Regions:
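Gly/Ser-centered flexible loop/linker motifs
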Residues: 235-239, 243-244
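Histidine-centered acyl-transfer/condensation active-site motif
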Residues: 243-253
Length: 253
């Protein structure tokens, strides 16, 4: 127990002097929690303990979103087996966006897809998501402050504005292009369900092509309303009809 309390060093896959792997140790920790009558939750970034009640509420909020967008359909495990596709495990990532005085717990349901399992099936371009250069942001700021200056591409009567948009749960937006199955989270299992798994309808955090899928999704959306996406860098976009320019960094516009 002292060894488990100390924990492994970050580069080790097992505890020093122990034949137990991390999966086995995780099962033991879960067992100890159940024996004590408590289920403890921890911040996946800081490692600090989080109030279980707040974590459960955050997870239920996330599950509400998952159900609303139809992230997956419940199907019999035999469907996945017939397709020859193994359902992938999922996990919760819990983070306190606030502090100990004012908690703001967020939970995200993520898949656990490993590189070793997909290196033969996913090509490099399917894993790539472009990022804008810092110079692009400086250019946008320069255009903003030269509003109405001759040669800047604007007229005196134009009022340029800059806005920043953060897209929540961006990786859930695109439709899933691959046939994928996941193990159902405990929060979505009901008595009498039987041996069900989830067949994904949309992309999901934790899958290796999720970022690329999101990029293709927003690019198609903007192209549909008159924007041109950059050729040298597809993280940039422009619409000449109203002189709108922008850059995308991940899920931030």
């Amino acid at each position: 127990l002292d060894m488990m309390t100390g924990g492994p060093v970050p580069t080790q896959a097992v505890f020093e002097g122990s034949d137990l792997d991390l999966d086995t140790l995780q099962e033991l920790c879960t067992m100890f929690d159940s024996m004590s009558g408590e289920s403890k939750c921890y911040d996946d970034i800081s490692g600090e303990e989080l109030p279980t009640k707040l974590v459960n509420e955050a997870r239920e909020t996330e599950m509400g979103w998952v159900r609303d967008i139809g992230l997956y359909d419940k199907v019999q495990r035999a469907v996945a087996q017939t397709s020859g596709i193994k359902p992938l495990p999922v996990m919760w990532v819990d983070v306190n966006k606030g502090d100990k005085e004012a908690y703001n717990v967020r939970s995200r349901l993520v898949g656990k897809e490993l590189k070793a399992k997909t290196k033969e099936t996913l090509l490099a371009h399917q894993l790539f998501s472009a990022m804008p250069p810092w110079e692009a942001v400086k250019t946008l700021l320069s255009l903003l402050v030269t509003d109405g200056v001759d040669g800047a591409g604007t007229s005196p009567e134009e009022e340029l504005e800059m806005a920043i948009f953060d897209i929540s749960r961006a990786h859930f937006m695109p439709k899933c292009k691959r046939e994928l199955y996941i193990e159902l989270p405990p929060e979505d299992r009901n008595p009498g369900d039987g041996d069900l798994v989830g067949r994904l309808n949309r992309n999901m955090y934790g899958f290796r092509d999720a970022a690329n899928g999101w990029s293709e999704d927003w690019q198609a959306t903007l192209s549909g309303v008159g924007f041109k996406v950059g050729v040298a860098n597809p993280a940039l976009f422009h619409r000449g009809s109203d002189n709108t320019r922008g850059a995308v960094h991940g899920d931030d516009f």
